[in-house]
């Protein structure tokens, strides 16, 4: 039986979503993901998170059988981070995020629908013009009416967690269908879908602020509903509507 590598050392600074963040990862899984985000500048930490062994072990017991303690640590730090960023006009959107034509596009879907499959189709269709930002937990922040998407070191087990940021082009909610079509999303369905994407990070203390963040994001971002199959034509259907020249 192999065990995750336990790290020696103390708290490290990282720059995640342009927030100086102190983390103390104990296992190599999160340390490897977080390394590209290491920060050596003079800014003071805005977020500080340290999790005890007792907390990590309690989280591990709640997770799917076979989950490693390293993966449980990554999941736990992700949850705490996403709670703390809410006051900074930021939110996690559970999605697969790509960089295309200088902008970030986030594709969100219920588990099993195929958000990662869809962004893989984009890579097949458009090759090196597409770069992956994060395949599970990108963050969006709003600055003076403009939204920016950020990669994070939290990968949800996908292995894709790059330190890339870009202006947000659109958020697309995916539904599976036999043929491909896309339409603009209405405000009530946007709020409902955003809520399900972020609900497990929201507490009573942060609920009002998160709703304010939703309102700000809806004001400055295009949202779409994409009904699609797994054919390469689905990427063209989405691209032709959401990418603005």
Q: Over which residues does each language-model region extend?
A:
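A noncatalytic interaction/capping subdomain that flanks phosphate/NTP-handling catalytic cores
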Residues: 2-106, 110-111, 121-131, 139-245
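Conserved lysine of the Walker
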Residues: 115
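Hydrophobic positions on the alpha1 helix immediately C-terminal to the Walker A/P-loop
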Residues: 118
């Amino acid at each position: 039986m192999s065990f995750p590598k336990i790290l020696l050392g103390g708290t490290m600074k990282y720059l995640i979503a342009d927030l100086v963040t102190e983390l103390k990862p104990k296992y190599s899984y999160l340390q490897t993901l977080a390394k590209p985000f290491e920060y050596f500048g003079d800014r003071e930490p805005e977020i500080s998170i340290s999790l005890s062994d007792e907390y990590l072990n309690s989280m591990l017991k709640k997770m799917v059988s076979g989950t490693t303690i390293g993966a449980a640590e990554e999941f736990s730090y992700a949850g705490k981070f996403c709670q703390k960023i809410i006051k900074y006009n930021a939110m996690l959107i559970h999605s697969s995020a790509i960089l295309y034509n200088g902008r970030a596009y986030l594709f969100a879907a219920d588990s099993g629908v195929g958000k990662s499959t869809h962004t893989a189709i984009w890579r097949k269709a458009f090759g090196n013009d597409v770069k992956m930002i994060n395949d599970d937990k990108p963050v969006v922040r709003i600055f003076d009416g403009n939204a920016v998407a950020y990669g994070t070191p939290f990968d949800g087990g996908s292995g894709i967690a790059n330190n890339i940021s870009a202006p947000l082009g659109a958020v697309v909610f995916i539904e599976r269908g036999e043929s491909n079509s896309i339409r603009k999303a209405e405000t009530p369905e946007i709020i409902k879908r955003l809520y399900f994407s972020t609900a497990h990070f929201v507490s009573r203390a942060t609920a009002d602020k998160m709703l304010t963040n939703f309102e700000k994001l809806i004001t400055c971002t295009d949202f779409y509903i994409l009904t699609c199959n797994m054919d390469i034509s689905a990427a063209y259907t989405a691209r032709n509507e959401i990418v603005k020249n």
